[in-house]
Amino acid sequence: MNQATEIAKLLLNIKAVTLNLHEPYRYTSGILSPIYCDNRLIISYPEKRKMIIEAFLQLIEKNHLSFDIVAGTATAGIPHAAWIADRLDLPMIYVRAKAKTHGKQNQIEGRIRKGQRALIVEDLISTGKSALAAGLALREKGVTVTDCIAIFSYQLPQAQQNFSDANINCHALSHFDTLIEMAVDEGYIDEIEKQKALAWNKDPEHWQP
């Protein structure tokens, strides 16, 4: 079993990812979806989160990612960014979706300087907007951002386009297609439901259960 498959199985086992083809979930965007991902659950499982961090470190090494500061997206990316930074003995920051309206009105928490190279850490990639917003905020402060890592990606066409437009590489530990295959193998869904899920993945805006 390869790493992407192991991560997919982990997410299904702890119910971080749930599938419901008959009563789909509605996202805040209004889109209906047969899949819902809540990777925040991982932090409650010490052994599972260790697996995730080890997988992240292997991904970083395999892809020769170069950076000197780890940037978590608020809030779900923060714990994973902290654990990665701790293992690599690197500075860590986190980036809000927008600046606070009180105090120092910071969007970026932690110390940064121009010329640094930041790695964005996200828990989930749907359209990629939160990760890319973090990358843009850092670039505006003179920080170089070329890569983002995430636990899971829905592999939506919009996300692929958004990352390409921003000239940021997105690396995920596991992906939608791998998870759907694992869901069939483990008996979470059948072949008919698998085809419906794949149809959603290709065109989520027009998908119907």
UniProtKB/Swiss-Prot annotation:
Orotate binds at S126. It catalyses: orotidine 5'-phosphate + diphosphate = orotate + 5-phospho-alpha-D-ribose 1-diphosphate. Pathway: Pyrimidine metabolism; UMP biosynthesis via de novo pathway; UMP from orotate: step 1/2. It is an enzyme of class 2 (transferase). 5-phospho-alpha-D-ribose 1-diphosphate binds at R96, K100, H102, E122, D123, L124, I125, S126, T127, G128, K129, S130. It comes from the Bacteria. Its cofactor is Mg(2+). Pfam families: Pribosyltran (PF00156). Gene3D superfamilies: 3.40.50.2020. Keywords: Glycosyltransferase, Magnesium, Pyrimidine biosynthesis, Transferase. One of its GO terms (molecular function) is orotate phosphoribosyltransferase activity. Belongs to the purine/pyrimidine phosphoribosyltransferase family. PyrE subfamily. Homodimer. This is Orotate phosphoribosyltransferase.
